[in-house]
Every structure is written in C-alpha cells, then in structure tokens.
Amino acid sequence: MAKLNIADIRQEYTKGGLRESELPGDPLSLFSRWLQEAIDAEVDEPTAVIVGTVSPKGRPSTRTVLLKGLHDGKFIFYTNYESRKGRQLAQNPSISLSFVWHAFERQIHIEGIATKVSPEESDEYFRKRPYKSRIGARISPQSQPIASRMQLIRSFVREAARWIGKEVERPDNWGGYAVTPTRIEFWQGRPNRLHDRFLYTLQPDGEWKISRLAP
C-alpha cells in the first residue's frame, strides 16, 4: 500500500467568526439560520448529517443520511428500522448528529435521544418520496449482505411490477426518527486554529446554558 503524504495538508480558516453577542438563547434558531445560509449558497447536500449510534457492546458506528425536518425542536430523518442504526437505536436511543459545511468553515454537533415518529407522520413523508425511491425502500434489506447487485435489481423490478397503477405503501420496517437534542455545539473556523466553539446544554428547567469551549 502506497504511503499517503497528508501530514502537511492544511488551510487557514478565514470565512468569519461567531461572537457571544450574536448568540440567540435558543440554539435551534441559530441552527436554522446556518442551514438556510448553506441552502441559499447552494452547497452540496446542505441537509446531509452524520448520524452516530452505539451498539450494546459500546461499539460506535456512523453513516450519512439527510435531515428531513425540524419540528417542535426535534430533528427528523427517515430510515429502515431494521438497518444497523435502527437496531442499535432500538437498544440504545442515544444518538449524535454532525453537520459540516466546508464552504462556510462551520460544523454543528448535536447529542440527544431518538424516538420513532408516528406511523402517520412516516406515511405522510413516504408518499412524498419519488416512486422509485419508495420501491427501493420496500425491497432493500438495508445493512444485510446480498449476493449481488443483480439480485437487488431483480427484486426492484419484481416489486415495481406489483405496484403498477397503485399507491406504493410504506413498509412497516421503514419510518422516521425524531431526535430531541440535549447538547448542541456550534463550531466556526478561525485563523491560527483559534476557532470559535459554543456549546448549548439543555437544563432541567428547559432553558439552554451557553458555554464557550477552547478550540
């Protein structure tokens, strides 16, 4: 294996700063502003979020999904409940979410608890998905080994034939999670690695405590 010469790859962070005077009391309003700025700037996959879960033995795993909503202070995404993350969340609902927008030199890291959304909410979103995505959700044994890509394609074709002229129904093993945050950190790159980091921590009375963290 060739040696990767990456030790000297670096860049300065000069896109902006984050001041205490700019921080709202509610972190979700700052999250919404940063996300909207990423959307308006047409960055690639602005809603992409790295989801971290933990196995019963404490082994962490991550994957990238798409945020599909922010409702009543909760972050919403959808997945296969029988996937690796679904199985882990069934045993340990603790979860982390990380957003990275390189164009703005910004990151947001969230910790919280995941719960399933209602079947009705999952149905409503599923109906909005493209037809082929709905078929794909029905036939994919997500995270399980399969013999070949051809097997997947054949399953897709057979399933699509079953639903010609009919509304494709959401499978029971597919739906949404709502993440209730307990900690939200905002990271803004700054020159000389003196980055701005602010941590919001949810208090027992429902208020958020704000702390500046060392970079």
PLM regions and their residue ranges:
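Binding-site signature for planar aromatic cofactors or substrates
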Residues: M1-P215
